[in-house]
Curated annotation (Swiss-Prot):
This is Siroheme synthase. It catalyses: uroporphyrinogen III + 2 S-adenosyl-L-methionine = precorrin-2 + 2 S-adenosyl-L-homocysteine + H(+); precorrin-2 + NAD(+) = sirohydrochlorin + NADH + 2 H(+); siroheme + 2 H(+) = sirohydrochlorin + Fe(2+). The gene is cysG. PROSITE patterns: SUMT_1, SUMT_2. The lineage of its organism: Bacteria, Pseudomonadati, Pseudomonadota, Gammaproteobacteria, Enterobacterales. Gene3D superfamilies: Cobalt-precorrin-4 Transmethylase, Domain 1 (3.40.1010.10), Methyltransferase, Cobalt-precorrin-4 Transmethylase, Domain 2 (3.30.950.10), NAD(P)-binding Rossmann-like Domain (3.40.50.720), Sirohaem synthase, dimerisation domain (1.10.8.210), Siroheme synthase, domain 2 (3.30.160.110). Residues 216-457 are annotated as: Uroporphyrinogen-III C-methyltransferase.
């Protein structure tokens, strides 16, 4: 280990920055956020420094580097574009045993500045030891996505409750279980973010009053249409907090690789016309695991409330009194159309879009007359096996036979394939495509030749 990570208490302590440009401004912003009493020494200053002076936030000393400014300092930063000046600052600080950071010259510095994730009072610092700042920044961005913006408020509130927790729970094990419940409680986090004091108090009292071995909860999470980059931040956070993940065939391997390593995984995949696990059994799996006190994530492709039977699963939990929540996902219609260069609505061609199930039950009948109307886009989910029927019915109820159609297979993934033609070819085109696939019908499909971008990458 070349550098020891430490967190400095700089509030009301003298610090010096030498330099008045953009880099110095970024460093000054960090020190000001930490509460430092800051002096900036430079020949010239960008306008932001004048703003800070007018607000009484720092002191400017215009002119060449004056090493006597270091005499009362706790910490210094050399941030000029002159290597000679930066070296002088470093040597002067070293002679006074003052820690000094030299921008872009880690070997000349006695400390380096990490990439920072600020969820005060929670702070995360990422450093490559000065060898690869870009790598540190990329790692910071990944970690940013895992930590909710309101996490700092939750941590601060936890500090206010420490004495009460210590008083109410006698053992370390009890306290640990309480804090585990506390930090994964979405209702509390959202109430704190909304500054809803009444809801915060109610949720807090509930946490203190319920047994520590209470029943678990289920979070219904939409995984999006395939591309792992389309999983929402909240969805990612939930699957990384799960004790068990119950998932289906439409959840990609890339997304499953993001699941917490020690979480149990239960596959309940389905295919049209064949159910690996009956829906009632899935409902019972969710119920049984939650009753064991586990945090269960039901992970579904697309959005769980759009042809995902999410409502049915939650009704079972609701009847049993199991707490649940829902994290929406990008539905296949939105993701597949965007990655195919097909806008679902367009001022000239479609003023509405209709999402339709093609998985028709025996005796079921769609409102074909309205579906065949002009100026709209139709998106059929699970429609491959019914493609010939969809073609026949739409034409019979007045849709033009040459209406553009597209079938999107494995949408948004690297395996995406788009087959397109006109309505009279729909049944034939469906024979060329494998599930999972989406059928899009409407004049907007003709825009694909202009707007297709994904296949070019």
């Amino acid at each position: 280990m070349d550098h020891l990570p430490i967190f400095c208490q700089l509030r009301d302590r003298d610090c010096l920055i030498v330099g008045g440009g953009d880099v110095a401004e970024r460093k000054a912003r960090l020190l000001l956020e930490a509460g430092a009493r800051l002096t900036v020494n430079a020949l010239t200053f960008i306008p932001q420094f004048t703003v800070w002076v007018n607000e009484g936030m720092l002191t400017l000393v215009e002119g060449p580097f004056d090493e006597t400014l270091l005499d009362s300092c706790w910490l210094a930063i050399a941030a000029t574009d002159d290597d000679t000046v930066n070296q002088r600052v470093s040597e002067a600080a070293e002679s006074r045993r003052i820690f000094c950071n030299v921008v872009d010259a880690p070997k000349a510095a006695s400390f380096i500045m990490p990439s920072i994730i600020d969820r005060s009072p929670l702070m995360v610092a990422v450093s490559s030891g000065g060898t690869s700042p870009v790598l540190a920044r990329l790692l910071r961005e990944k970690l940013e996505s895992l930590l909710p913006q309101h996490l700092g408020q939750v941590a601060r509130y936890a500090g206010q409750l420490r004495a009460r927790v210590k008083k109410q729970f006698a053992t370390m094990g009890e306290r640990r279980r309480f804090w585990e419940k506390f930090f994964v409680n979405d209702r509390l986090a959202q109430s704190l973010a909304n500054a809803d004091e009444k809801a915060v108090n109610a949720t807090t009292e509930h946490l203190f009053s319920e047994p520590l071995d209470h029943r678990g909860e289920v979070v219904l999470v939409g995984a999006g249409p395939g591309d792992a980059g389309l999983l929402t931040l909240k969805g990612l956070q939930q699957i990384q907090q799960a004790d068990i993940v119950v998932y289906d065939r439409l959840v990609s391997d890339d997304i499953m690789n993001l699941v917490r390593r020690d979480a149990d995984r239960v596959f309940v995949g389905k295919r049209a016309g064949y159910h690996c696990v009956p829906q009632e059994e899935i409902n019972q799996i969710l119920l049984r695991e939650a009753q064991k006190g586990k945090r269960v994530v039901r992970l579904k492709g697309g959005d769980p409330f759009i042809f995902g039977r999410g409502g049915e699963e939650l009704e079972t939990l609701c009847h049993a009194g199991i707490p649940f929540s829902v994290v929406p996902g990008i539905t296949a219609a939105s993701g597949c159309s965007a990655y195919s260069g097909i806008p679902l609505t367009h001022r000239d061609y479609a003023q509405s879009v209709r999402l339709v199930t093609g998985h028709l039950k025996t005796g079921g009948e769609l409102d074909w007359e309205n579906l065949a109307a002009e100026k709209q886009t139709l998106v059929f989910y699970m429609g491959l096996n019914q493609a010939a029927t969809i073609q026949e019915k739409l034409i019979a109820f007045g849709m033009e036979a040459n209406m553009p159609v597209a079938l999107v297979e494995n949408g948004t993934s690297v395996k995406q394939r788009v087959v397109h033609g006109v309505l009279t070819q729909l049944g034939e085109l469906a024979q060329q495509v494998e599930s999972p696939a989406l059928i899009i019908v409407g004049r907007v499909v003709a825009l694909r030749d202009k707007l297709n971008w994904f296949s070019n990458h």
